[in-house]
Amino acid sequence: MEEAKIPMLELGPITFNLTLLAVCIVTIAVIFAFVFWASRQMKLKPEGKQTALEYLISFVDGIGEEHLDHNLQKSYSLLLFTIFLFVAVANNLGLFTKLETVNGYNLWTSPTANLAFDLALSLFITLMVHIEGVRRRGLVAHLKRLATPWPMTPMNLLEEFTNFLSLAIRLFGNIFAGEVVTGLIVQLANYRVYWWPIAFLVNMAWTAFSVFISCIQAFVFTKLTATYLGKKVNESEE
C-alpha cells in the first residue's frame, strides 16, 4: 500500500502543511463572512442575524467581565470574541465532510485536530498574556508576580508551562477524538449495506454531540485565556 503523502510547502528552513493552511484560511473566511453578513443593515431593535451576533458578543463579554478588571475588559473584548469564534469554527470544520486522496490522506480536517496547531495557538496565548502583563504592569511588577512568594518561584514557573501545555492538549484530545469516532462510524456504513441506516442515525447523533462538545471547548479555551490574562494584567492581582 502506497504511503499517504502530506501536501507540503518549503520556504527556506520552514515547512508548511498546505492542508492545515487551507483549512485555517477556510475558518477565517467563514468567520469573516458570518460577521460581515450579520453586521449589515443593523437596526436599533435587533432581529434575526443581528440578534445572533449581538448574543455572541454579549456572551463573550460576560466571560471577560468575570476575569478582567472593569476598566480593562473592553480593551480585550474583541480579542476574546475573535478567539472564541475561531476556535468554535475550527473545532467543527472537520465534522461534516471528508476529502480523501487516493492514498488515503484526509484533505479536510479541523485545524484544532492537529497537535502542532494547538501547541502554536497555545504558545500565542501564553506569549500574549505575558507581553500584556509587562505592558500593563511593567517588567519588574510582572516578574515580581512570578516570584511571589519567592519559595514558590519554581512552582509558579512550572504552572506557567503546564498552563501552556494543558491548553493545547485539552483542545487537541477532544477534537481529535471526535473526528476519529466520526471516521469509525463512516467505516461502519461501508462495511455492510444493511449497516448504512444504523450508521447514518448514529452519525447524526454523534455529529450533534460533537458540535456541542466543540462549542464547549471553544468556551473553555476562551475562559482560560481570560483567566490567564486577568492574572497578568489586573490591578487586583497585585
From Swiss-Prot:
Gene3D superfamilies attached to this UniProt entry: ATP synthase, F0 complex, subunit A
Membrane topology: Multi-pass membrane protein
Keyword Zinc-finger tagged: no
Localization per Swiss-Prot or TrEMBL: Cell membrane
Keywords carried by this UniProt record: ATP synthesis, Cell membrane, CF(0), Hydrogen ion transport, Ion transport, Membrane, Transmembrane, Transmembrane helix, Transport
Annotated CDD domains: ATP-synt_Fo_a_6
Domain of life, per lineage: Bacteria
GO MF terms held by the record: proton-transporting ATP synthase activity, rotational mechanism
Cellular component terms (Gene Ontology): plasma membrane; proton-transporting ATP synthase complex
Membrane-crossing residue ranges in chain numbering: 18-38, 76-96, 114-134, 166-186, 193-213
Gene Ontology biological process terms, A to Z: proton motive force-driven plasma membrane ATP synthesis
Family: Belongs to the ATPase A chain family.
Known partners and oligomeric status: F-type ATPases have 2 components, CF(1) - the catalytic core - and CF(0) - the membrane proton channel. CF(1) has five subunits: alpha(3), beta(3), gamma(1), delta(1), epsilon(1). CF(0) has three main subunits: a(1), b(2) and c(9-12). The alpha and beta chains form an alternating ring which encloses part of the gamma chain. CF(1) is attached to CF(0) by a central stalk formed by the gamma and epsilon chains, while a peripheral stalk is formed by the delta and b chains.
PANTHER family tied to this protein: ATP SYNTHASE SUBUNIT A, CHLOROPLASTIC
Functional summary from the UniProt entry: Key component of the proton channel; it plays a direct role in the translocation of protons across the membrane.
Protein name in UniProt: ATP synthase subunit a
